[in-house]
């Protein structure tokens, strides 16, 4: 499926399901023996976004109500579901431990087998960072921020000369 945008419209077109292909190290073409249809495994929901965590683990942000909501919902489609994809095993594991009304910041940060995601809730609580274990899919609440929302998370590192 392809997303098309204009200043007042965002709509998904096409019929292909969300999926993954790979290019093996040193190759220049897609591996013809590797294709994963995300809409046939895990929660069977299409992908909104995908980020590398570590090794062959990827954090997926999914359309929680499935393909129909993705196609008809436009910018109001529910994208509040996270899952971990393990590429070698071709498995998807839902992330647990997140608030039910969580909305996610733009970019997570991945390091040493964990993804760190900014989460804002609608219940009046302050936003917080959640640490997601790539191998278990378990999210644990970390630092709470005195703000209305958090848009992203990252790491700054001082490089000495």
Predicted segment positions?
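Repeated scaffold domains used in trafficking and secretory/extracellular systems
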Residues: 40-53, 100-110, 145-159
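Short, solvent-exposed coil/turn segments at beta-strand boundaries
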Residues: 1, 24-27, 52-58, 107-115, ...
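C-terminal hydrophobic structural anchor segments
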Residues: 82-122
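Acidic, serine/threonine- and glycine-rich low-complexity intrinsically disordered segments
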Residues: 1-58, 62-65
């Amino acid at each position: 499926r392809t997303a098309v945008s204009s200043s007042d419209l965002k709509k998904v077109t096409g019929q292909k399901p969300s999926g993954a292909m790979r290019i093996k190290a040193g190759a220049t073409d897609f591996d013809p023996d590797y294709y994963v249809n995300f809409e046939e495994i895990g929660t069977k929901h299409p992908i909104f976004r995908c980020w590398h965590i570590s090794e062959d683990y990827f954090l997926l942000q999914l359309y929680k109500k499935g393909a129909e909501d993705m196609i008809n919902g436009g910018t109001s489609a529910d994208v509040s579901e996270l899952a971990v994809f393990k590429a070698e095993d071709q498995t998807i594991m839902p992330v647990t431990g997140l608030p039910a009304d969580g909305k996610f910041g733009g970019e997570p940060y991945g390091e040493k087998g964990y993804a760190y995601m900014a989460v804002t809730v609608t219940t009046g609580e302050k936003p917080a960072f959640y640490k997601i274990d790539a191998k278990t899919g378990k999210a644990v609440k970390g630092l709470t921020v005195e703000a209305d929302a958090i848009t992203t998370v990252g790491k700054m590192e001082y490089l000495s000369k």
